[in-house]
């Protein structure tokens, strides 16, 4: 099937929306966040995966942002994973139901906290004990990371004025690299340097929304 025909068929289903099979993948293209939510509402318990389409800026097409797509997925117990390419103007991201026992990343925990406050999490998902735990369990700041920040007087002064959510996200990002010592040191140094200058780090995929 040609790329032109693929996109034509995908666009023709926007109003419902319905997924199409493209090169063996179940692909979904939505113009608006509410369409993605509607699809999840009808399929989150029955489907096992979908490849969501993100148009490039150069395409001139309207699509759902990565962050909005992830938020809606979390509302229905799904998470994002592998990235792919549909064509030169359209990227793909695989969304699947979250595996039981799979840990939530700190950005996703922050998303869940906000979504819970807004009452957007599906009742069946909100009733899950793992979701409850993710939302309500206090974050533990590793003492060695705090000690490293305290060692820089100006950085520590500025650090204390940052929001709790920002500190959780950035410290968790540093901590996640512990098994890669060089990367861990790089992340910690970058955070301390930025904090000394009283600058926040802009994260991936719109995570700064949660730097409340």
Across the structure, where does each feature detected by a protein language model lie?
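Charge-dense, helix-prone N-terminal extensions
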Residues: 2-212
């Amino acid at each position: 099937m040609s790329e032109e025909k693929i996109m034509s068929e995908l666009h023709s289903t926007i109003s419902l929306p319905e997924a199409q099979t493209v090169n063996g993948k179940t692909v979904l293209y939505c113009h608006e966040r509410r369409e993605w939510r509607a699809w999840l509402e009808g399929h989150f318990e029955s489907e096992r995966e979908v490849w969501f389409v993100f148009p490039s800026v150069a395409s001139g097409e309207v699509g759902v942002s990565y962050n909005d797509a992830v938020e809606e997925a979390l509302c229905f117990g799904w998470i994002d994973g592998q990235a792919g390419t549909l064509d030169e103007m359209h990227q793909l991201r695989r969304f699947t139901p979250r595996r039981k026992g799979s840990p939530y990343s700190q950005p996703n925990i922050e998303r869940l906290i906000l979504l819970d406050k807004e009452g957007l999490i599906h009742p069946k998902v909100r009733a899950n004990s793992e979701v409850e735990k993710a939302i309500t369990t206090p974050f533990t700041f590793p003492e060695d990371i705090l000690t490293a920040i305290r060692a820089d007087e100006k950085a520590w002064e500025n650090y204390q004025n940052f929001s709790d959510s920002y500190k959780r996200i950035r410290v968790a990002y540093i901590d996640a690299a512990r098994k890669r010592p060089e990367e861990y040191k790089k992340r910690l140094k970058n955070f301390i340097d930025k904090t000394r200058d009283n600058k926040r780090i802009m994260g991936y995929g719109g995570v700064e929304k949660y730097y409340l």
